[in-house]
Regions:
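Residue-level hotspots within transmembrane alpha-helices of multi-pass secondary transporters
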Residues: 38, 70-71, 125, 155, ...
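Small-residue-rich alpha-helical segments with characteristic i,i+4
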Residues: 145-147, 153-158, 162, 290, ...
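Helix-loop junctions on the cytosolic side of multi-pass membrane transporters
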Residues: 186-206, 253-262, 359, 425, ...
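Transmembrane core module of solute transporters
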Residues: 13-73, 77, 96, 106-108, ...
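Membrane-embedded alpha-helical segments of multi-pass transporters/permeases
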Residues: 97-101, 185-190, 249-253, 352-355, ...
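Transmembrane alpha-helical cores of Major Facilitator Superfamily
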Residues: 27, 59-63, 90, 144-148, ...
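Hydrophobic transmembrane architecture of multi-pass small-molecule transporters
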Residues: 2-3, 8, 183, 407-473
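Helix-loop-helix hairpins in multi-pass membrane proteins, especially solute transporters
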Residues: 69-208, 235
Length: 473
C-alpha cells in the first residue's frame, strides 16, 4: 500500500499542457461514441449487413463502456489514477486498430466491445485529474473545460466521420485515434506521473460485476434484437427480458449490502447526486439517440452523402463551444438548477421543431434546430455536472463521477436503441396506413397514379413501385 498527501495544483505551462493531454484523451473517447454515426450505412454496405445490424457498432460500444465505468473506482485504488488512465489510453489505441482492420461485422463488434470496455475509466479519471490539477477556486473552470470536450466529441464526430468516410475509408475513423492516443498517453505520463494517487489492495466485487454485466448485456441485446425477433412474441426476447429484470433486482440487493460494492448505490441518498445523475442520463439518452438517427435519416431518405449529413449536424457545436466557457464563469454566481431547467426547455423547443420535418425539408430548416440545440447543450452539461459533484467529500468524487458517467453512457445506448426502434415501428405503421389507400376503388389514388404515369412516362408496375418508394420516404 502506498500513501501520500494530495499534491497541490499545477501551474503555468504544466497546467496548460496537462489539461490539453487529458482533454484530448477524453475527446478521443467521446468522439468514438458518435464518429461512426454517419458511417453506419457505408460500414453496413461494406460488411454485407443491414443498417439496423450496423447500428450495433454504436450501441455495443456504449454498453461495454457503461459496464466498465463502475470498475474505475476499484482499478484506481489498485493501480493509481495516472497508471490506469495512461494504460486505458494505450489499450484504446490498440482496440481502435483492431476496429480498423476488422473484415466482418462480428470481428468489428468484438473490437468495439474491447474499445468500449477499456475506455470506461477515461471519462471519470479525466474529470478527477483535471479537478486535482486546477486550484479549488477554479474548479468551475476545470468542469467547463471537461464539459466542453464531452460536448465537442459527439458534435465533431458526425462531421469528421462523414468527411473521412466520403473522402477516404471508414477504417480511418478508427485509425485517427492512434496518433492522438499515443500523444495523449505520453504527455499525461510526463506531466502527471509524480502526482500518482495512493494505492491499496481491495477485494473486487466479483458477484456485483457479473450481475452488472448480466442485466446490462441482456437488456441491450433485447433492445437491439427485439424488432428482428418480433419482440415479446419471441421466447428469446422474453427470456432476455426476464434475465435483465431479475439480474437488475439481484444487482440492487447485492450492491446495497456489499461492503465494497462495484457501484456505490448509496450515493443516490445524496439528493443533488441523485437528481443530477437522473437528469443528465435521461437527457443524454434523448440527445444521443437523435444524434444517431438524424444522419441515417438524411442518408436513407433525403439522399444526403455521408459528408453532407455530417456537415448538417456540425452546427450543433457552434453555440455549445462558444457558451460553455461562459457557463464556467457564471456558474459560481448562479443557481445551476435554473440553468439546467432552461436547458431542458430549450431541448423541448428543438425537438418540437424537428416534428415538422418531412421528406422535402429544406437544408436550412434541417440545420436550424441543430444550430439552436447548441444553446441548451452548453447550459446542460456544466450545471448538472456541478450539481452531481456538489457537497461530496473528495474521496467520493471518483466513485460519483464513475456512477454518473455510467448512467449517462448506458442511457445513451438505451436511448439509441429505443429511438431507432420507435422510428422503425412508426415507419411501418405509416407505410401500412398509406398503402391501405392504394386500391383501384379509391378514385383519388387512381387519379394520382394516372397523373404520375403520364408525367413520368411510367408503366403501371413502375408507377406502383414509384408510389411504394414515395411511401417509404
Amino acid at each position: 500500500m502506498s500513501s501520500s498527501s494530495p499534491p497541490g495544483p499545477l501551474t503555468g505551462a504544466r497546467l496548460a499542457i496537462g489539461t490539453i493531454a487529458v482533454s484530448l484523451a477524453m475527446f478521443m473517447n467521446v468522439l468514438d461514441s458518435s464518429i461512426a454515426n454517419v458511417a453506419i450505412p457505408t460500414i453496413s454496405g461494406d460488411l454485407g449487413v443491414s443498417v439496423d445490424e450496423g447500428t450495433w457498432v454504436i450501441t455495443i460500444f456504449a454498453a461495454a463502456n457503461a459496464v466498465s465505468i463502475p470498475l474505475t473506482g476499484w482499478l484506481t485504488q489498485r493501480f493509481g489514477q495516472v497508471r490506469l488512465f495512461v494504460t486505458s489510453i494505450l489499450l484504446f489505441v490498440f482496440a481502435s486498430w483492431l476496429c480498423g482492420i476488422a473484415p466482418n461485422l462480428p470481428t468489428l463488434l468484438a473490437a468495439r466491445i474491447l474499445q468500449g470496455a477499456v475506455a470506461g475509466p477515461l471519462a471519470p479519471l479525466s474529470q478527477a485529474l483535471l479537478l486535482g490539477a486546477w486550484p479549488r477556486q477554479k474548479s468551475a473552470t476545470a468542469l467547463a473545460l471537461w464539459s466542453m470536450t464531452a460536448l465537442v466529441g459527439p458534435i465533431a464526430g458526425p462531421s469528421l466521420g462523414g468527411w473521412i468516410t466520403y473522402d477516404y475509408n471508414w477504417s480511418w475513423i478508427f485509425y485517427i485515434n492512434i496518433p492522438v492516443g499515443f500523444f495523449a498517453a505520453a504527455v499525461t505520463w510526463i506531466v502527471f506521473r509524480d502526482r500518482e494517487s495512493a494505492t491499496r489492495r481491495l477485494p473486487i466485487d466479483t458477484v456485483g460485476l457479473l450481475l452488472l454485466v448480466l442485466w446490462v448485456a441482456s437488456l441491450q441485446i433485447m433492445l437491439d434484437k427485439g424488432k428482428d425477433l418480433d419482440w415479446f412474441n419471441s421466447p428469446v426476447i422474453v427470456a432476455l427480458g426476464i434475465v435483465a429484470l431479475v439480474g437488475f433486482a439481484f444487482f440492487l440487493v447485492w450492491e446495497l449490502t456489499e461492503a465494497n460494492p462495484i457501484v456505490d448505490l448509496r450515493l443516490f441518498t445524496q439528493r443533488n447526486f441523485a437528481g443530477g445523475t437522473i437528469a443528465i442520463s435521461v437527457a443524454y439518452g434523448m440527445f444521443f439517440g437523435t444524434l444517431v438517427l438524424l444522419p441515417q435519416w438524411m442518408q436513407g431518405y433525403l439522399g444526403y452523402r455521408a459528408i453532407d449529413s455530417g456537415l448538417a449536424t456540425a452546427p450543433l457545436g457552434i453555440f455549445a463551444i462558444l457558451l460553455t466557457p461562459v457557463m464556467g464563469r457564471i456558474l459560481p454566481r448562479t443557481d445551476p438548477r435554473y440553468l439546467a431547467t432552461l436547458a431542458f426547455v430549450g431541448f423541448a423547443v428543438v425537438f418540437m421543431m424537428r416534428t415538422t420535418f418531412y421528406s422535402d425539408v429544406s437544408h436550412w430548416d434541417l440545420v436550424l434546430p441543430t444550430l439552436l440545440q447548441g444553446i441548451p447543450m452548453a447550459m446542460f452539461f456544466v450545471p448538472l455536472t456541478a450539481i452531481i459533484l456538489s457537497g461530496l467529500p473528495p474521496e467520493k468524487i471518483p466513485a460519483a463521477a464513475g456512477l454518473s458517467n455510467f448512467g449517462r453512457t448506458f442511457c445513451g445506448a438505451v436511448g439509441t436503441s429505443l429511438i431507432s426502434n420507435a422510428w422503425n415501428d412508426r415507419t411501418i405503421l405509416h407505410h401500412v396506413r398509406l398503402t391501405e389507400q392504394a386500391s383501384p376503388g379509391n378514385p383519388i389514388f387512381a387519379q394520382q397514379l394516372d397523373s404520375a404515369r403520364s408525367l413520368l412516362h411510367l408503366s403501371p408496375d413502375s408507377a406502383l413501385a414509384f408510389f411504394n418508394t414515395s411511401v417509404d420516404s
